[in-house]
């Protein structure tokens, strides 16, 4: 029993010691009680055994080859980008798990810059790597960020997203990965210093520089702007990996202007911009090119690894629809299966969907919206039709509002 019959004092059910001036005992249901000291012991026990980092110091970090193999299951194409990212992530966590001793060489962070068109897989690559490493992951849109004191999001709000995705565990968040999308949109308006404030350009780059290189940041727990006397969350960004991505429209012309030279001698040829692959040009990007584009030199120096992504071809988009573990068509087939519908896509239909994404210039990002629009009526009708059903998608239905997919009932007896 929790209560001593003789003295009437509560007794802790765990340590069997009575309530006193130095021991507070809280009664619970069923005659159970616990003292404040046992509560403290339980809290210490939970904290000591709680797993805050799936990646531990035992050295069991996935190798670059294992990371790439995992990426291959979810991401089609972009072989060079996969290899570069796999090595960068491996080296980053290897560096964390082996902190330098006194007088040791200090290894700097391997932050990554991804250059590639919209829908080429930049976000998916970063997200899939974080999934494999089992670390918190956050996506930030650079276009929403503004310099402190102006309308918009503070840079620190990026860190708040990471903390929230780590369920409030600061230590776990400090091992996470942040993907900053559309980093090219915060380029300063010109190479010359302007007399007017560039609140969403160079000022944001300066603010990003601090958290990317590693600092102890103060984050408002509820988001928004900082206020005096407000309690702040403290987070060290030293071990957070930053992957930045952008389309960098116009950067190819800057690179072309630098590498193009006048022909020397008879028969000399100069490869024109129209004849060069965009990825081929991005592979030759130098820090000076990025400075001319509008990024500040200090920020470029903190993102040492740069890799170009290929523009996805129709063949790539066709494979994306059917091959990955979570391929879009596989997802829709599983969804329709729950309503007892067998969904099939003709090969020509899949190719037509890929071509439509190319025509719309949306890349892989636009594939899902195309299929969603195509399947809307069928998804609306399927739950109301009883029995085993079939739905076949052919080429004529793609982009043709007059030829909509229709569900066929296979077993009339069950209808």
From Swiss-Prot:
GO function term, MF aspect, one: zinc ion binding
A Pfam family annotated for this UniProt entry: zf-C4_ClpX
Annotated Gene3D superfamilies: 1.10.8.60, ClpX chaperone, C4-type zinc finger domain, P-loop containing nucleotide triphosphate hydrolases
InterPro entries in the cross-refs: AAA+_ATPase (IPR003593), ATP-dep_Clp_protease_ClpX (IPR050052), ATPase_AAA_core (IPR003959), Clp_ATPase_C (IPR019489), Clp_protease_ATP-bd_su_ClpX (IPR004487), ClpA/B (IPR001270), ClpX_bact (IPR046425), P-loop_NTPase (IPR027417)
UniProt record, GO biological process: cell division; proteolysis involved in protein catabolic process
Gene Ontology CC: HslUV protease complex
Keyword field contains Magnesium: no
Keywords: ATP-binding, Chaperone, Metal-binding, Nucleotide-binding, Zinc
Binding site for Zn(2+): 12, 15, 35, 38
Protein residues bound to ATP: 117-124
Keyword presence, S-adenosyl-L-methionine: no
Complexes and interactors: Component of the ClpX-ClpP complex. Forms a hexameric ring that, in the presence of ATP, binds to fourteen ClpP subunits assembled into a disk-like structure with a central cavity, resembling the structure of eukaryotic proteasomes.
Function as written in the Swiss-Prot or TrEMBL entry: ATP-dependent specificity component of the Clp protease. It directs the protease to specific substrates. Can perform chaperone functions in the absence of ClpP.
Similarity comment text for this entry: Belongs to the ClpX chaperone family.
Name under which the protein is recorded: ATP-dependent Clp protease ATP-binding subunit ClpX
Organism: Treponema denticola (strain ATCC 35405 / DSM 14222 / CIP 103919 / JCM 8153 / KCTC 15104)
């Amino acid at each position: 029993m929790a209560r001593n019959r003789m003295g009437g004092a509560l007794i802790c059910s765990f340590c069997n010691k009575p309530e006193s001036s130095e021991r507070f005992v809280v009664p619970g249901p069923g005659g159970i009680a616990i003292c404040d000291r046992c509560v403290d012991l339980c809290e210490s026990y939970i904290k000591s055994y709680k797993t805050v980092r799936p990646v531990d110091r035992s050295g069991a970090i996935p190798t670059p080859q294992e990371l790439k193999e995992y990426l291959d299951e979810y991401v089609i194409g972009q072989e060079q980008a996969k290899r570069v990212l796999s090595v960068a992530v491996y080296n980053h966590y290897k560096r964390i798990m082996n902190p330098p001793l006194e007088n040791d060489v200090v290894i700097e962070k391997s932050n990554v810059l991804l250059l590639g068109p919209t829908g080429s897989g930049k976000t998916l690559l970063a997200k899939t790597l974080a999934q494999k490493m089992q670390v918190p992951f956050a996506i930030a849109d650079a276009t929403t960020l503004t310099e402190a004191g102006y309308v918009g999001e503070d840079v620190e709000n990026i860190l708040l997203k990471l903390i929230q995705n780590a369920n409030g565990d600061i230590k776990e968040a400090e091992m996470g990965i942040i993907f900053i999308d559309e980093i090219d949109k915060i380029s300063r308006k010109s190479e010359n210093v302007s007399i007017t404030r560039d609140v969403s350009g160079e000022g944001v780059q300066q603010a990003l520089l601090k958290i990317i290189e590693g600092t102890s940041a103060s984050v408002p727990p509820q988001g928004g702007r900082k206020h005096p006397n407000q309690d702040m969350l403290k987070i060290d960004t030293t071990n957070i990996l930053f992957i930045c991505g952008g389309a960098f429209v116009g950067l190819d012309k800057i690179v072309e202007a630098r590498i193009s030279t006048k022909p020397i001698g008879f028969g000399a040829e100069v490869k024109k911009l129209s004849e060069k692959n965009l990825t081929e040009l991005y592979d030759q990007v130098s820090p000076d090119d990025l400075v001319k584009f509008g990024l500040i030199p200090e920020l470029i120096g903190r993102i040492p690894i740069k890799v170009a992504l290929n523009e996805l071809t129709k063949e790539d988009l066709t494979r994306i629809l059917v091959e990955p573990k979570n391929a879009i068509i596989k997802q829709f087939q599983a969804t329709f299966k729950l309503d007892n519908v067998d969904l099939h896509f003709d090969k020509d239909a899949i190719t037509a969907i890929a071509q439509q994404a190319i025509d719309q210039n949306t890349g892989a990002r636009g594939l899902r919206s195309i299929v969603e629009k195509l399947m809307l009526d069928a998804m609306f009708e399927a739950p109301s039709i009883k029995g085993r059903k079939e739905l076949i998608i052919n080429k004529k239905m793609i982009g043709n509002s007059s030829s909509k997919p229709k569900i066929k009932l296979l077993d009339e007896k069950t209808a």
